[in-house]
Amino acid sequence: MDLPGLIHDFLLVFLGLGLILGGLGVVLLANPIYSAFSLGLVFVCISLFYILANSHFVAAAQLLIYVGAINVLIIFAVMFINGSEYSKDFHLWTVGDGVTSVVCTSLFVSLITTIPDTSWYGIIWTTKANQIIEQDLISNSQQIGIHLSTDFFLPFEFISIILLVALIGAIAVARQ
């Protein structure tokens, strides 16, 4: 999307805040339904980021697959869970939460210290040169097909297996 700089920056900050608030909602909200809706907010914000980056096909796929299918499946599964049996065993803070917090905080600090030291200039020009060559030869849908069948074949297959397992799990839960 070709927007003026100020509007583009405002939308980036607004969507970034939506991502942060949605992520915090997923982690901190005690009600699993609210957490699932917060996850939907995160997926929508990611989709809007793709629109800002001029990746309209990826944004549409993000909305259809993650918001339209995965998030609905999560909400469907959460609604089958009886909340009363889990709420009495709920402890506010456990040892695993502390270990996870330490690991995530150390990963965040290492990323924050690494990102400013990285030379992004060469990476950007190399990527742009590759994109120019690819854009001249084939269309966007052909590029996506080529990348899915070559560069991203293994992750694509893993995602399809995960979706198959989720679908089988949803059917098993629905039959009970």
Swiss-Prot record:
NDH shuttles electrons from NAD(P)H:plastoquinone, via FMN and iron-sulfur (Fe-S) centers, to quinones in the photosynthetic chain and possibly in a chloroplast respiratory chain. The immediate electron acceptor for the enzyme in this species is believed to be plastoquinone. Couples the redox reaction to proton translocation, and thus conserves the redox energy in a proton gradient. Coiled coil: none annotated. One of its GO terms (molecular function) is quinone binding. The chain crosses the membrane at residues 10-30, 33-53, 61-81, 92-112, 152-172. Belongs to the complex I subunit 6 family. The keyword Plastid applies. Keywords: Chloroplast, Membrane, NAD, NADP, Plastid, Plastoquinone, Quinone, Thylakoid, Translocase, Transmembrane, Transmembrane helix, Transport. It is an enzyme of class 7 (translocase). The keyword Chloroplast applies. PANTHER family: NAD(P)H-QUINONE OXIDOREDUCTASE SUBUNIT 6, CHLOROPLASTIC. GO terms for cellular component: chloroplast thylakoid membrane. NDH is composed of at least 16 different subunits, 5 of which are encoded in the nucleus. It is found in: Plastid, Chloroplast thylakoid membrane. InterPro entries: NAD(P)H-Q_Oxidoreduct_6, NADH_UbQ/plastoQ_OxRdtase_su6, Nuo/plastoQ_OxRdtase_6_NuoJ. Its EC number is 7.1.1.-. It catalyses: a plastoquinone + NADH + (n+1) H(+)(in) = a plastoquinol + NAD(+) + n H(+)(out); a plastoquinone + NADPH + (n+1) H(+)(in) = a plastoquinol + NADP(+) + n H(+)(out). It comes from the Eukaryota. It is a multi-pass membrane protein. This is NAD(P)H-quinone oxidoreductase subunit 6, chloroplastic.
